[in-house]
A protein has these predicted regions:
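Active-site residues of response regulator receiver
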Residues: 13, 57
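Helix N-cap/capping motif at the beta->alpha junctions
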Residues: 35-44, 65
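Short amphipathic alpha-helix used as the core "switch/output" element in two-component signaling
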Residues: 44, 66-77
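Active-site beta3 strand of CheY-like receiver
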Residues: 49-55
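Receiver (REC) domain active-site loop signature in two-component systems and cognate sites
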Residues: 60
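CheY-like receiver
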Residues: 122-143
Length: 143
């Protein structure tokens, strides 16, 4: 299980009320939260901070969430992205760069469990390197 201590979630939404309610939800569940009110600001924060996951609104002025997600994945492909929309299901072409799509009408616990699942699935670079080194050294001993 991923420790929420120092786990940073970036929330991007042009509606301040939704942004603040998600920030409060995530902080009350132990996450550190960065907020951005648009795609360009979200990209800047992603590039300048250590972000563990992104919660991204779909419909925003200037650049929709699907376009922002593509740019974010190009910059940091390992960071999971949850795309939110109040407008129901989106075509698959809009979801190619995101890890999960959720309707904004889902209960908050669904967002929390989705984030936890995504964070638990992430590769852990140090552990993976250590384990692969250990395994390669010990495979010869077992044969």
């Amino acid at each position: 299980m991923t420790s929420r201590l120092k786990t940073t979630i970036l929330c991007v939404d042009d509606h301040w009320s939704g942004l603040i309610s998600r920030k409060m939800l995530l902080e009350s569940n132990g996450y550190q939260v960065l907020v951005a009110t648009g795609g360009d600001e979200g990209l800047r924060l992603l590039l300048s901070h250590s972000v563990d996951a992104v919660v991204l609104d779909y419909q925003m002025p200037g650049m929709n969430g699907d376009v922002v997600a593509v740019k974010m994945k190009r910059a940091k492909s390992h960071v999971p992205i949850v795309l939110l929309s109040a407008y129901g299901p989106l075509p698959q072409s809009k979801l190619d760069a995101v890890d999960t799509f959720l309707s904004k009408s889902h209960p908050p616990k669904i967002l929390l469990s989705t984030l936890q699942d995504l964070l638990n699935r992430r590769p852990r670079p140090f552990f993976s390197r250590w384990f692969n080194t250990w395994r390669s050294r010990n495979e010869g001993a077992r044969q």
